[in-house]
Swiss-Prot record:
Residues annotated for ATP 1 binding in this entry: G204, E205, P206, G207, V208, G209, K210, T211
Subcellular location: Cytoplasm
Annotated spans, Repeat 1: 6-71
Listed NCBIfam families: chaperone_ClpB
Subunit note: Homohexamer. The oligomerization is ATP-dependent.
Region called NBD1, residue ranges: 157-338
Record protein name field: Chaperone protein ClpB
Region NBD2: start-end pairs: 556-764
Residue stretches in coiled coil: 389-523
PROSITE patterns hit by this protein: CLP_R (PS51903), CLPAB_1 (PS00870), CLPAB_2 (PS00871)
GO process annotations (BP): cellular response to heat; protein refolding
Keywords: ATP-binding, Chaperone, Coiled coil, Cytoplasm, Nucleotide-binding, Repeat, Stress response
Highest taxon in the source lineage: Bacteria
């Protein structure tokens, strides 16, 4: 008996037997300890054989442990030095060596030892383990392979370990129904039916349904809807991760891969191997001086001994497979295109039953149509049908979560009851009459509340129970349909008619009755919602993208109708500009904008300080209740020709390639924004070439080749071009407008200006507008003082004084802000610090002999 001839699992079993003996305080390794060592191996061969024989592994282990306890124990601690093999155990190992030679194996494996044990140990007959049955199961697992290395188990039933049988999964109903894709499946069948190079590879963008095509082929094989050459074939989906995982020693991965390929080869063409993400085979398992999986496949692929279906994305095909021409020419490509919206709707209708059964909710057809159309319109960085399926799944999960959670009304009652209970505990400690009276009132209120809570809880439980019944009936219907499919395949017409006209008809009637009951109860103030509608889909799209696609509420409609008035409250003296912008937003919100262009694009022209940038910020505030959704790009930073890369990201090979562009990254994260290009005349003219496709098609390709969607943005550009003409003519006559337009045309190319929706000229601010701005500025100052509870009042004289002194037509409203800071805010700050103006006081700001004075009133 040569220990060098032991396989890894044999050594592991003996070591386990040593530990069991030491734990049992026995100085010799009994045959039962060795048997336990074999049976307790994780993922070992012997536990697998026992399970395939239909025996209870845990029962055998417990019986052997009882036998172990019958042997004498020693009092001293047992160490590795003073432990030895029992005479009978030694005899079993010698017999195992003879069995190894009889089976023409090179190494002593666990199956040899277990066979020797069955022959030598009568206890196994008690468990119902016969030699004939053992050898039959062993040969089914082992086949005609010989033990010619120290890890032979790696080559036994490798497909069962490292792959899944898709045809079997389809038989069990674990694969979703595949709708459409007939031309791709037919082409795959044609390629597989070839004599040589019969290996199709499906290439397409992530999420277009490459894996689904192979699952569809598996379903067709199951239904017999394939040519004779493919009937009764099996498709095994190989798990490359499991194949590589745990391959510690050099050559172990190759051994597993060889086992897979040999098993496929020995099936005589009955097994088709499906490798999802096939680019992972290039370089998989490669180490110094060893082959990768791709090179191991090549010879068999070329000879047609191996039928492989691969699936990978276009980018990864180009990056990995095309770089290896010898591997590429062995595959025949099938391009899988993204389905259109109509095809996606058909796919979703086919999957509807599966999702309804899983989540226990009802999915309306409007939700399905909305999922396909909204995902196509708003989720641009993913592909159909995957993104639409995800929308339906998440919306159904949201409704299911709401069903399982406590309804809001009941939750409020529970919280209120808890609050009253706390109050009762506190009042019980009081002894005065008022507290006792209050205690009685609260106890009565709590009793009423608990009664109401009890009624609502009962109603909630009943509604949940009804919905749960529907879910269970749907699950039963699904199981009956699976049985019907099986009966149809086996041509068992008696069973098929029994199921179809008996069990299925009864269940469908039961489902209809239960559904009608839930619908009837639902009309009477139901606590739970059990339907996925278009509103839920719109809600999920809004959460994913930040774009408000849900139906407009009455308050939002009201807000949009009065958008012009709301903006005028903050922006003074530019009524024409405000009207143009507000009208554009109204058209967009009502759904009348061009769906392939931004919501609107404007150039604001005018002198400095007239409110061009402020209007953009105010618009964002009114649309989003925050100025954070303004993406501001200061064009003075783009004075060089090459600085355009900062907008869209550096090209490959340049520093900053991975970081993306300032504009594209901002819109990818916030696709619903106001984009403000400030001071556009300061930028290099070539920078605007990149904006042409944004203004025309509402899209821009960044430095990494990703398409960024600008269809939900409002683009505003500001400029001081022609401001000297505007200052000379405050009333903006037609002649002045033409002069400004001519100067603009001289600066920018016609193809750029032609794509702008509207060019708006801002007037220079007149004195009445400045007075309104003074009032707004003083109101802002009052808001700053709110934490100190100081209110401000100011006289009309004061407003006129500030307007006349701070106004400069060349500089607009900006000098006004500086003047208020200098003359009012500084003086007021000094008075607050000197305690001349106190908290919770009312301060009048007035004028006295052309001096600003502060009085507490």
């Amino acid at each position: 008996m040569n220990p060098n001839q032991f396989t890894e699992n044999t050594i592991s079993a003996i070591n386990l037997a040593v530990d069991i003996s030491k734990g049992n305080m026995q100085q010799s390794i009994k045959p039962e300890a060795l048997a336990l060592g074999l049976l307790m191996q994780n993922n070992g061969l012997i536990p697998r054989v026992i399970e395939k024989m239909g025996l209870n592994l845990q029962y055998i282990i417990s019986e052997l442990e009882k036998e172990m306890n019958n042997y004498p124990k020693v009092e001293v601690k047992v160490s590795n030095e003073n432990i030895s093999l029992d005479q009978k155990t030694n005899s079993i190992l010698n017999r195992a060596e003879k069995i190894m030679n009889e089976m023409e194996d090179s190494f002593l494996s666990v199956e040899h030892i277990f066979k020797a044990m069955i022959e030598e140990m009568p206890i196994f007959k008690r468990f119902g383990i016969s030699l004939e049955k053992y050898m039959e199961v062993l040969m089914n697992i082992r086949g005609n392979r010989k033990v010619d290395n120290q890890n032979p188990e790696a080559t036994y039933e490798v497909l069962e370990k490292y792959a899944k049988d898709l045809v079997e999964l389809a038989r069990e109903g674990k694969i979703d129904p595949i709708i459409g894709r007939d031309s791709e499946i037919r082409r795959a069948i044609q390629i597989i039916s070839r004599r040589t190079k019969n290996d199709p590879i499906l290439i397409g963008e992530p999420g277009v349904g490459k894996t689904a095509i192979v699952e569809g082929l598996a379903q067709r094989i199951l239904n017999g809807d394939v040519p004779e050459s493919l009937k009764n074939k099996k498709i095994f989906s190989l798990d490359m991760g499991a194949l590589v995982a745990g391959a510690k020693y050099k050559g172990e991965f190759e051994e597993r891969m060889k086992g897979v390929l040999k098993e496929v080869e020995e099936s005589n063409g009955n097994i088709i191997l499906f490798i999802d993400e096939i680019h992972t085979i290039v370089g998989a398992g490669k180490g110094e001086g060893s082959l990768d999986a791709g090179n191991m496949l090549k010879p068999m692929l070329a000879r047609g001994e191996l039928r492989v279906i691969g699936a990978t994305t276009i980018d990864e095909y180009r990056k990995y497979i095309e770089k290896d021409p010898a591997l590429e020419r062995r595959f025949q490509t099938i391009l899988v295109n993204e389905p259109n919206v109509d095809d996606t709707i058909s796919i979703l209708r086919g999957l509807k039953d599966k999702f309804e059964t899983y989540h226990g909710v009802r999915i309306t057809d409007t939700a399905i149509v909305e999922a396909a159309t909204l995902s196509q319109r708003y989720i641009s960085d993913r592909k159909l049908p995957d993104k639409a399926i995800d929308l339906i799944d998440e919306a159904a999960a949201m409704i299911r979560t709401e069903i399982d959670s406590m309804p809001e009304e009941l939750d409020q009652l529970t919280r209120k009851a808890l609050q009253l209970e706390i109050e009762i505990k506190a009042l019980e400690k009081e002894t005065d009459d008022a507290s006792k009276e209050r205690l009685k009132v609260i106890e009565k209120e709590l009793a009423e509340l608990n009664e109401e809570k009890k009624v609502l809880t009962s109603k909630w439980e009943l509604e949940k129970e009804d919905i749960s019944k529907i879910k269970n009936i749907k699950r039963e219907i699904e199981n009956v349909k699976l049985e019907m499919e099986k009966a149809e395949r086996e041509y068992d017409l008696t069973k098929l008619s029994e199921l179809k006209y008996g069990k299925l008809a009864t269940l469908e009637k039961e489902l209809q009755e239960q559904q009608n009951k839930v619908d009837k109860d639902g009309k009477e103030n139901s606590l739970l919602k059990q339907e996925v509608t278009a509103d839920e889909i719109a809600d999920i799209v809004s959460r994913w993208t930040g774009i408000p696609v849900s139906k407009l509420t009455e308050t939002k409609k009201e807000k949009m109708l009065h958008l012009e008035d709301h903006i005028k409250e903050r922006v003074k003296g530019q009524d024409e500009a405000i009207k143009s912008v507000a009208d554009t937003m109204l058209r967009s919100v009502a759904g009348l904008k061009d769906p392939n262009r931004p919501m609107g694009s404007f150039i604001f022209l005018g002198p400095t300080g007239v409110g061009k940038t402020y209007l953009a910020k105010t618009l964002a505030y009114n649309l989003f209740d925050s100025e954070d959704n303004v993406v501001r790009i200061d064009m003075s930073e783009y004075m060089d020709k090459f600085s355009v890369t900062r907008l869209i990201g550096a090209p490959p090979g340049y520093v900053g390639y991975e970081e993306g562009g300032q504009l594209t990254e901002a819109i990818r994260t916030k696709p619903y924004s106001v984009i403000l290009f400030d001071e556009i005349e300061k930028a290099h003219p070539d920078v605007f070439n990149v904006l042409l496709q944004v203004l025309d098609d509402g899209r821009l390709t960044d430095g990494q080749g990703r398409i960024v969607d600008f269809k939900n943005t409002l683009i505003i550009m500001t400029s001081n071009i022609g401001s000297h003409f505007i200052l000379e003519d405050p009333n903006l006559s037609e002649d002045t407008r033409e002069k400004v337009a001519d100067e603009l045309k001289a600066r920018f190319k016609p193809e750029f200006l032609n794509r702008i929706d509207e060019i708006i000229t801002f007037k220079a601010l007149d004195l009445p507008a400045i007075k309104e701005i003074v009032k707004l500025s003083l109101k802002d100052l009052e808001n700053k003082l709110k934490p100190k509870h100081i209110t401000l009042e100011f006289s009309d004289k004061m407003v006129d004084y500030l307007a006349n002194n701070a106004y400069d037509p060349h500089y607009g409203a900006r000098p006004l802000r500086r003047y208020i800071q200098r003359e009012i805010e500084t003086s007021l700050a000094k008075k607050i610090l000197a305690n001349e103006v106190h908290e919770k006081s009312n301060v009048l700001i007035d004028l006295d002999n052309n001096h600003i004075v502060f009085k507490e009133v």
